[in-house]
């Protein structure tokens, strides 16, 4: 459930970032924000399925007769986003674009822009890793982006947005 919570917090960041970066780039920021909403929404759905539906199915599978187990294996539902383009790809593109746009904002730290662009690329690595069937890209993205740099960027960006809103 922690991933579901993190994704819901990501949706809140999209709203705040949209307001922060909209001036001078309204159409672009609105467009990538919609992409982020789609990505985070699908991520949330996938994570809920992982923690709720799949364990329940596993319980039924273990208790089922062999014929039913075969049927359950054959009827395994397809993931909502098997390539991760709509989830990690869309969110990564949003992170990349808002941080690229932030370079032109005088009150936005340059190091945060660079860190954010790297985080965006690492999100996109998940989709590329799935498309190219290269587990190493997914592992790099999960380790470096998901555990280390992503949380640092989100925290720093959140502090900056809070300062801008409540100086």
Question: Residues of each region from the PLM?
Answer:
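Hydrophobic, aromatic-enriched alpha-helical segments typical of multi-pass transmembrane helices
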Residues: 1-167
